[in-house]
Amino acid sequence: MSTKVRKCKEQARVTFPAPEEEEDEGEDEGAEPQRRRRGWRGVNGGLEPRSAPSQREPHGYCPPPFSHGPDLSMEGSPSLRRMTVMREKGRRQAVRGPAFMFNDRGTSLTAEEERFLDAAEYGNIPVVRKMLEESKTLNVNCVDYMGQNALQLAVGNEHLEVTELLLKKENLARIGDALLLAISKGYVRIVEAILNHPGFAASKRLTLSPCEQELQDDDFYAYDEDGTRFSPDITPIILAAHCQKYEVVHMLLMKGARIERPHDYFCKCGDCMEKQRHDSFSHSRSRINAYKGLASPAYLSLSSEDPVLTALELSNELAKLANIEKEFKNDYRKLSMQCKDFVVGVLDLCRDSEEVEAILNGDLESAEPLEVHRHKASLSRVKLAIKYEVKKFVAHPNCQQQLLTIWYENLSGLREQTIAIKCLVVLVVALGLPFLAIGYWIAPCSRLGKILRSPFMKFVAHAASFIIFLGLLVFNASDRFEGITTLPNITVTDYPKQIFRVKTTQFTWTEMLIMVWVLGMMWSECKELWLEGPREYILQLWNVLDFGMLSIFIAAFTARFLAFLQATKAQQYVDSYVQESDLSEVTLPPEIQYFTYARDKWLPSDPQIISEGLYAIAVVLSFSRIAYILPANESFGPLQISLGRTVKDIFKFMVLFIMVFFAFMIGMFILYSYYLGAKVNAAFTTVEESFKTLFWSIFGLSEVTSVVLKYDHKFIENIGYVLYGIYNVTMVVVLLNMLIAMINSSYQEIEDDSDVEWKFARSKLWLSYFDDGKTLPPPFSLVPSPKSFVYFIMRIVNFPKCRRRRLQKDIEMGMGNSKSRLNLFTQSNSRVFESHSFNSILNQPTRYQQIMKRLIKRYVLKAQVDKENDEVNEGELKEIKQDISSLRYELLEDKSQATEELAILIHKLSEKLNPSMLRCE
């Protein structure tokens, strides 16, 4: 007994009323005894049961889930079938008292039944035992006017001994409802007693829902003849999971009970279609109740071999359902967050690096051996958490400490160095990058190779390579910083017979280096696309930005190359057919003459013009790519996250903005399209001018005179003033301020949780460098290293072994076909011996399973301790009062028996004394 319980017992002062005299057996059955009226009290115009000696429910009582009774008007409903069966069995629907609001017909209880229900409700163990043993006419299934029988009353008031006595009777009704009631109130010992009843010997009792049980039994889970106490889809294990009863969930799992995962929301099977057609609301509620049970920490802890993986997958599934079933969006979001909190809670209980690694990496012993060999720290759970955006799990100190250790792998001394030393290392790597690449090509497995393969060095190398690429972009335009010497209307050539376009389309050495860098980055993106798959690749916005940037670069250089080819062909024509040395004195064909023109005469669709435009866009995207590495810094990381969230808000705002903008643009164009040349300026006379005027009006760069006409058409002009004014008020005052408010709200959300957001973004950046590969940055990655050839040959050699290993795994999982088994078992004796040893290993729990079992045990113990700390004294005080009440009846029974024995002794003594007195007389 805990210290809190002892204190409660010391503080408890229970005053018991005087024992009531037993009523005469011949009492009028139609009259309601005063004793029965004291058992009930009026509440808000109705009646509410009052259990002596306290009315409060114990702390931790789980309110029943949403419940609705069946439609009695429906022909062939379970309630009508149940009532028919009860009439056939001769069960009498009695009521406790004259109030008939809860029953269609009222039948008064006999005095014996009144006394029996009283004893069961108040825990009078001696009376219940005596009536069950001696009475021949007692109906143990008699009910009060609320429809509760003796078992339900005893369970509701936590009378364990009375419940055990009642469970010994045959044909006892509503045992399932009593079990659900005991689970909801947290009466573990009563739950255990009910589960030991022969009625639960069949496992189907615990796996089928009450609505399915109604098709087989009359009232096993029923509260009364009108339906169940809880929702018809609530099974005992679902209710126990809802109420977070770990002991009860464990008992039910040992009995074979499981929560069936609902079908996919878009499932078209016959069962789902029938439920959706019959009652869509009930079907949706049943799905929510099932997911509440599946997402319960009690069920996740005790039912899954890998609770962390199960919780992560379930959180993602619930998040998707929140976006699908909008009407239950908040419910599904809470359940998804509950699963995420469970994972964080388990991670928080780790005590050493081995346990942290087990959670972050998953079960490495069940993974492919080649994958484990290639990288011991797979971090599969961290990758999954990042994919499902479980930010608190990734940003947890235990996870961050482990990631930081891997980040400085093979560079343990650098972790404790100052910022100045780290910056010096970055500078050295940037300057010596070509030499480091050569050293890695020659000796990839040397000390230098191991250092370059560390995530930090890979990050520094890639960042330095990209900085060099940006430097090339700037240097390529440095000759035009102070202006150009060749004006757009001037042509300059190296020799008289040279075509001007040949000079302008030639590639410089910086442009060639830029193209090499672009090819290297494109090769890296192709490898990443191959490894991750198209879907995972596109889901990462930085990959989309990289792909777009590189595509524009390639398009720009392609257009530039086409222009160079055309100019070269023109030059070849001139060299072959023109004899004069000065082209200005020669008449050339139009298609050749075009390439001698100055820039001001080029066509708008000229490939070189298109190339220059695309190149400018690609340069802008290249510099914006710097934001990718900003999360590595604690100061700039939150700013980059806020910028990304702001861009999302702008895209959302653009929908409303475009709608309003397009409406006024078309309206103003229709109004002024007839006045081309009759306005002060050309605003709104064409669609293009209308777009320009309204767009720059947002920034205050349009004039009010844009709506003024030269003619005296005041009506049109006034309408223009009104529409233009409404547009400015709507766009500038309303929508722009709304956008500012949205951006401010998003920034505040990031700022309030900046540490978690930054660590989550930094972890995503780190993980991109944790996997093997991408050691050398572009453009050095274009040259394959000797290690790549060795790995390629090893894959070819090990391909048959990998195939046999997959076949062995399929057979062990019961998935291999007969042909696969035949091919496998015809291998050498050594292979057979290895398979036998592998099977023997499978029979033993893996190291991961042992660690997970230890962590889950801590989690359950912590949950139970937290629950005990949260409980108030009222619940424990009521339990003490109930025990004292039962003890009172036992003492009264002992007193009654002692009185009877004393009366018998006095009678015997008087019989012996009377003859002696007569003889004396």
Curated annotation (Swiss-Prot):
Xref: Gene3D superfamilies: 1.10.287.70, Ankyrin repeat-containing domain (1.25.40.20)
Official protein name in the record: Short transient receptor potential channel 3
Entry binding sites for Ca(2+) 2: 525, 528, 543
Region (Binds to IP3R3): 850-870
One term under GO cellular component: plasma membrane
Source superkingdom: Eukaryota
Organism in which the protein naturally occurs: Homo sapiens (Human)
Keywords: ANK repeat, Calcium, Calcium channel, Calcium transport, Cell membrane, Disease variant, Glycoprotein, Ion channel, Ion transport, Membrane, Metal-binding, Neurodegeneration, Repeat, Spinocerebellar ataxia, Transmembrane, Transmembrane helix, Transport
Methyltransferase is among the record's keywords: no
Chain ranges on the Cytoplasmic side, renumbered to this chain: 1-459, 528-540, 631-649, 740-921
Binding positions for Ca(2+) 1 per the UniProt entry: 158, 883
Taxonomic placement: Eukaryota, Metazoa, Chordata, Craniata, Vertebrata
Gene Ontology molecular functions: calcium channel activity; calcium-activated cation channel activity; inositol 1,4,5 trisphosphate binding; metal ion binding; store-operated calcium channel activity
Topological domain ranges for the Extracellular compartment: 478-508, 563-606, 674-713
Cross-referenced SUPFAM superfamilies: Ankyrin repeat
